[in-house]
């Protein structure tokens, strides 16, 4: 055998050896990952996220697991958590109800998987994901999943094994955070609506939500498009496999549409485009679509802090409509006697008196937005600065929002300060300043600052970090509905 043949054989052997090693490692991970609960029990680390919004998942999972009576299981994201009165559905249908919606950043796939813990003959499963490309895809977030599993690691057994690799990769960071908090004697204890005790036993959010808190009545970072293009084909196949599984258990699957803020609809939305959207869903989802998307579009004053989250009045309107849809699907002709509340008028948003103009106010360019301003640019003087602070007021009006192109031309900018007045930041805002590496966040509440949960920092400097002036601010953001996905960029203050 000549030298060249020897080398080729050695290479071939090396490739086979590498391939075998990869297969062995993959098999090892599949075997070891289910052992994590045992390791955690041995170490006896306390639950870290049980008071957080994600901590609610274990209660939803166990309610479903323990409910053997005939039941209605509503599977989806946070629009289900914020949009259903389960007791009202029980009253009018005679079924037990499990609200099995929580958080878009977990993804719809994991909620479908976990719901398999206890679906039986005679049950009804209503599938109601948000109308968003992320929730209508195979999206899986290992970081938020670990936080949600924190209270009950037995849920690992119901997660698709294809996601084990992502979970394993995220495990060191999760354990590091848990150990760090344990050593310091600290815990994750957020304030506001996004915490576990905002839910009742059914899994509905019962935290008081009197009116729409969004500046201008809608979230400008989240335009809603009613089109078949928002559905991922792989997700549709997975969803239809799930529907087939539900039917195999002797249960019935229905599909409905989540509530949609009329003010947030894409400008091209029309009656015809809505009908075409319905036709697409009805043709591609292998179960009865029991709702008309047009009836899911509600006026803005029925919403709370998101274009998919309802306030208390909106919950009643949405639940009554869902019961009517169920009645039609079940062949019932009963008349409903549910009093529908009027949409509550929110108070005028002006900002407190202590918000003042300062030396920063003259460095930005503004456009009118919701009785105040949004920032759309920076002056030439401001573009030359390495540090900027977003003002609270300008010309006597509150500054509410930051648009995606506001920092275009700010190549010198390295540090930016944001205070409590800002209620929305559009994706692209941070990437417009390529050298920005430090954001000082001087606010404690995260729920009133809406951002895109997946793409906010796309294109931004990879070294960018968010610094907080208080531990409660850090906690509320790192566990916050809109901000939790960016927890790895957040720096806990040293106090």
Labelled PLM ranges:
Residues 1-21:
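N-terminal Lys/Arg-rich, disordered targeting/topogenic segments
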């Amino acid at each position: 055998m000549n030298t060249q043949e020897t080398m080729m054989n050695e290479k071939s052997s090396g490739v086979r050896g590498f391939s075998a090693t990869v297969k062995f490692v993959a098999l090892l991970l599949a075997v070891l990952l289910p052992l994590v609960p045992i390791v955690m029990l041995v170490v006896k680390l306390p639950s870290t996220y049980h008071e957080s919004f994600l901590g609610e998942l274990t209660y939803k999972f166990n309610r479903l697991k323990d409910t053997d009576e005939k039941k209605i299981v509503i599977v989806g994201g946070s629009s289900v958590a914020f949009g259903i009165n389960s007791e009202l559905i029980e009253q009018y249908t005679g079924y037990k109800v499990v609200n099995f919606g929580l958080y878009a950043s977990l993804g719809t796939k994991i909620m479908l998987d976990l719901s398999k813990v206890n679906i039986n003959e005679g049950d009804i499963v209503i599938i109601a994901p948000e109308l968003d490309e992320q929730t209508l895809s195979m999206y899986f977030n290992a970081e938020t999943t670990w936080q949600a599993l924190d209270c009950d690691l037995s849920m690992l057994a119901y997660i698709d094994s294809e996601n084990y690799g992502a979970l394993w990769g995220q495990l060191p960071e999760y354990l590091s955070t848990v150990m760090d908090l344990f050593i310091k004697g600290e815990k994750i204890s957020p304030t506001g609506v996004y915490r576990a005790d905002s839910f009742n036993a059914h899994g509905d959010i019962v935290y008081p939500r009197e009116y729409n808190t969004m500046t201008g009545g809608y979230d400008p970072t989240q335009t809603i498009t009613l089109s078949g293009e928002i559905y991922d084909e792989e997700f549709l196949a997975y969803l239809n496999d799930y529907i087939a599984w539900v039917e195999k258990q002797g249960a019935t699957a229905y599909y409905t549409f989540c509530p949609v803020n009329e003010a947030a609809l894409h400008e091209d939305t029309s009656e015809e485009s809505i009908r075409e959207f319905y036709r697409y869903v009805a043709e591609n989802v292998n179960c009865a679509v029991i709702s008309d998307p047009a009836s899911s579009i509600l006026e803005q004053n029925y919403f709370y802090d998101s274009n998919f989250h309802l306030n208390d009045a909106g919950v009643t309107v949405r639940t009554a409509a869902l019961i009517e849809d169920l009645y039609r699907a079940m062949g019932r002709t009963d008349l409903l006697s549910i009093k529908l509340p009027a949409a509550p008028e929110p108070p005028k948003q002006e900002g407190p008196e202590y918000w003042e103009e300062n030396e920063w106010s003259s460095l930005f360019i503004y456009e009118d937005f919701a009785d105040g301003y949004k920032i759309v640019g920076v002056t030439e003087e401001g573009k030359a600065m390495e540090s900027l602070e977003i003002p609270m007021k300008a010309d006597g009006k509150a500054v509410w929002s930051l648009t995606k192109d506001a920092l275009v031309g700010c190549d010198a900018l390295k540090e930016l300060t944001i205070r409590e007045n800002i209620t929305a930041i559009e994706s692209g805002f941070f990437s417009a300043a390529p050298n920005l590496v430090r954001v000082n966040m001087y606010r404690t509440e995260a729920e009133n600052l809406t951002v895109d949960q997946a793409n906010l920092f796309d294109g931004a400097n990879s070294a960018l970090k968010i610094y907080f002036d208080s531990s409660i601010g850090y906690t509320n953001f790192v566990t916050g509905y809109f901000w939790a996905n960016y927890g790895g960029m957040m720096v806990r203050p040293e106090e």
